[in-house]
């Protein structure tokens, strides 16, 4: 696919699609709650539609209208054995959180996914769940999907110190803890996104959060809710960077989620001298959201490491692109988690942007980016990773001559089916 190139002046306002993390969880909590849950501004992209499909297979009635998703909750105990394996496609969130949800059920389940899922590490979820009494294993006894879960296991409380900073692992343990006897205590390594914790409260449950320590009691019941999912800050990030690096641009992004565990990119943009303003922030059905305005800016290199990394882990590919247009060197470290995403994002970012003229050195846990470098035409690939594909389209906007051909552009539909249309809507 030929990408859009040689564009100046991205001007206008868009509303990015609903938050992917929250869309997944809204279906999950709607299913394990009792009564009806109504979800608006749900992300209708491949990953989240896969979560709907999985819960339908588990016997949950889910209706889809143009405006809403309506989940008729069954409670944990109302989930039924699927007729066959649950195929969750490309969604790491779905497989890992479902492992926690299904660990305490009284039926057996097999969960599988695409070739990318089959390469992603699952011991980080399986080991703590096994410690709680769950019985599960990967293919041929490995840690890789398909994952087989044996039902009718009695889950017990535990105290767990997380070896990695991962919201997916934390959430899987929380879902299992809700079905366990007693109180489970989780100690996070670093603060990660906390949508699961907030949704427990939104759906009428109880959870204690004190710094990096989380306490959750088993045996809780949830009640269906009405909710509006805010725009995904990870999707907004591509337009934030486009507005900062494309000459003559000013972009307004409306109804963007502003959960502080997700807004690390705002801090980095300001560190680099970028013009980013948040206005009209408000709480819509308990979720903080607002309008983000960015303008073309002169940028300088910076260092990105430590506890900010979990707050922007999914944005690092497009932050790396931003750094190619900043004066000086940008160093990103403590981000080894990027190697076990949909692809090895450290290598993918360096390889593809270097093809276009960037000066990026991959490291064991991050990237060293020397700016400012002009970008030129090249043939590039998404590696089947939605965030790499979208980042390369933003990079292509700066290419003045020739074509940028993207292999596997369809990956973008995992999280942002209307991405290319929204880019075109901002062109003068």
From Swiss-Prot:
UniProt KW keywords: Amino-acid biosynthesis, Aromatic amino acid biosynthesis, Cytoplasm, Transferase
GO CC, one annotated term: cytoplasm
Role, per record: Catalyzes the transfer of the enolpyruvyl moiety of phosphoenolpyruvate (PEP) to the 5-hydroxyl of shikimate-3-phosphate (S3P) to produce enolpyruvyl shikimate-3-phosphate and inorganic phosphate.
Stated family: Belongs to the EPSP synthase family.
Residue ranges that the Swiss-Prot or TrEMBL entry lists as coiled coil: none
The protein's name in its UniProt record: 3-phosphoshikimate 1-carboxyvinyltransferase
Binding site for phosphoenolpyruvate: 20, 92, 120, 168, 345, 387
UniProt pathway: Metabolic intermediate biosynthesis; chorismate biosynthesis; chorismate from D-erythrose 4-phosphate and phosphoenolpyruvate: step 6/7
A GO biological process held by the record: chorismate biosynthetic process
Stretch forming the signal peptide: none
């Amino acid at each position: 696919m030929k990408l859009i190139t040689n564009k100046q002046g991205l001007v206008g306002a868009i509303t990015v699609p609903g938050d992917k993390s929250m869309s997944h969880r809204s279906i999950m909590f709607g299913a394990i709650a009792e009564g009806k849950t109504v979800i608006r501004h749900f992300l209708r992209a491949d990953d989240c539609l896969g979560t709907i499909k999985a819960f339908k297979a588990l016997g949950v009635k889910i209706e889809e209208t143009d405006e809403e998703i309506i989940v008729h909750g069954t409670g944990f105990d109302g989930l039924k054995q699927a007729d066959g394996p649950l195929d969750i496609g490309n969604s790491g969130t779905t497989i890992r959180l479902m492992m926690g949800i299904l660990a305490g059920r009284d039926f057996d389940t097999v969960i599988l996914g695409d070739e990318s899922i089959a390469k992603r590490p699952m011991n980080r979820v399986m080991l703590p769940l096994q410690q709680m009494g769950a019985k599960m294993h990967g293919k041929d006894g490995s840690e890789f999907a398909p994952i087989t879960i044996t039902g009718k296991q009695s889950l017990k409380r535990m105290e767990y110190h997380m070896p990695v900073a991962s919201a997916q692992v934390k959430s899987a343990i929380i879902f299992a803890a809700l079905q366990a006897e007693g109180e489970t205590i989780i100690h996070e390594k670093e603060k990660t996104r906390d949508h699961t914790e907030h949704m427990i409260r939104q759906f009428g449950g109880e959870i204690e959060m004190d710094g990096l320590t989380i306490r959750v009691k088993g045996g809780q019941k949830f009640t269906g809710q009405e909710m509006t999912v805010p725009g995904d800050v990870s999707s907004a990030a591509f337009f934030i960077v486009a507005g900062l690096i494309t000459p003559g641009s000013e972009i307004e992004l409306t109804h963007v989620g502003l959960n502080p565990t997700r807004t690390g990119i705002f801090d980095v943009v300001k560190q680099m001298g970028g013009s980013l303003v948040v206005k009209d922030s408000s709480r819509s059905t308990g979720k903080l959201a607002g309008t983000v305005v960015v303008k073309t800016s002169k940028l300088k290199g910076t260092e990105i490491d430590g506890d900010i990394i979990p707050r922007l882990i999914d944005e690092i590919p497009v932050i790396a692109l931003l750094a190619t247009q900043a004066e000086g060197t940008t160093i990103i470290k403590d981000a080894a988690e990027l190697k076990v995403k949909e692809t090895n994002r450290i290598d993918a970012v360096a390889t593809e942007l270097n093809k276009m003229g960037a000066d990026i050195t991959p490291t064991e846990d991050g990237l060293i980016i020397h700016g400012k470098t002009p970008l030129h035409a090249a043939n590039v690939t998404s590696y089947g990773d939605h965030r790499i594909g979208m980042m390369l389209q933003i990079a292509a906007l700066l290419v003045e001559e020739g074509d940028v051909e993207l292999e596997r552009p369809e990956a973008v539909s995992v999280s942002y089916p209307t991405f290319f249309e929204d880019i075109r809507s901002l062109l003068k």
